[in-house]
Amino acid sequence: MYHIGQGWLPTVAVALSATFCRLLPLHRLALGPRLRPASAWRAAKRLQQLAVPADVRFNAPMFLKRLECSACGLEHDPSRLQNLCRSCNKPLFTIFDLAAASRTMTRATLVTRERSLWRYREVLPLPADVGPVSLGEGGTPLLRVRTFADDFELWIKDESLNPTQSFKARGMSVAVSMAKHLGATKLAVPSAGNAGGALAAYAARAGVEAHIFMPRDTPRANIVECRELGAHVTLIDGLITDCGAEIARRKGNEGWFDMSTLKEPYRVEGKKTLGYELAEQCDWQLPDVILYPTGGGTGLIGMWKAFDEMQALGWIGTKRPRMFAVQASGCAPIVRAFDAGEKDAAEYPDAHTIASGLRVPKAIGDFLILKILGQSNGGVIAVADEEMIRFARAVGSSEGLFVCPEGAACFAAFKSLRGAGKIASGERAIIFNTGSGIKYLDCYQDQ
């Protein structure tokens, strides 16, 4: 048996295999048919010539036009560090010149690009001559789920395979890249767990400071992760909103740049790559239904932004999935507001749930989430903690995936919506598992 480095043939085979797997379009890897061996060899040989090492950026021009308030439309200068709108304190969105971007980024050119979120470089804000802060984020699998589906087509987008084992890596890669580029040296974030770990990792990679404020009852794995990655960790008696308030109180004197959810404009740009990847993996035919675990809602908001951009690029049509926000029964501000027909969500009192990513009593992007749910003819559903544990175990024992409680909540939601007739037979539904169950071991003790 040959080992790597023993003879030329296995070395070439390994190199071609790695190149082929990294650069083959995502929908081929996840959904499409296998290529014939001869075709695969020719494709691998061609793609090897075009291969881009993971740490090397594409020489793509930047098409960022402006920053614009998502509520009042006021423009802001993208050449400076920005937080919320200076007029109305609402989140800022990045606006791109999509007509110009479409000249260098097409569905065909994506075939030659590395399997990471930076494959969509033209619709990301970092200048072309600046290297991203990257740990290989993006390119996560889309897997068919058969156990719970019956005559439904159910898939899971497994974000636990990102660096730091959660979808938060997407947002932090882009946001830390931009913060460093614009001169920030000290970054701060309130976190229920996964955002803190992601900031700690990407700040370490970028050579900047990370200051993370977490509720004292955050799962221990998340706290240890942040500390071992070199971050300054402060534990607070309270919720994530209390952590955010402490950052707001101290950031001026400490020189911190606030990286809170939607309080800077670039985490959502990283999260929107969920939408681009999903469309690519589905061969540019969006699913009928998306079930998304919703705390701060950046992923849901980002995907909707991606769908609008892809339509402008001519990559997809006008069809949109019905978006369902899945929350915990013990912290369901979006569920309560949607059911009441409100445009904003009031702070949820006495918030509690084992799903730390869903324990967000007040989301700054609530008005955006509620607008998307209405536009998509989607809806909301709240899931009890006991159901999260039950479905996490069911998914693990039947599908081989150790999902986080937030992801498990989506499986419970799917079953409920299917039973209520809100997902029809034959429709394609996609569940997002936003993190690894390994980070929530405290939840499964003595259960």
Task: Label each region the model flagged.
Residues 2-3, 27:
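Intrinsic-disorder-associated, low-complexity terminal segments enriched in Asp/Asn/His/Tyr and depleted
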Residues 34, 55-58:
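Short, positively charged and aromatic/hydrophobic N-terminal segments
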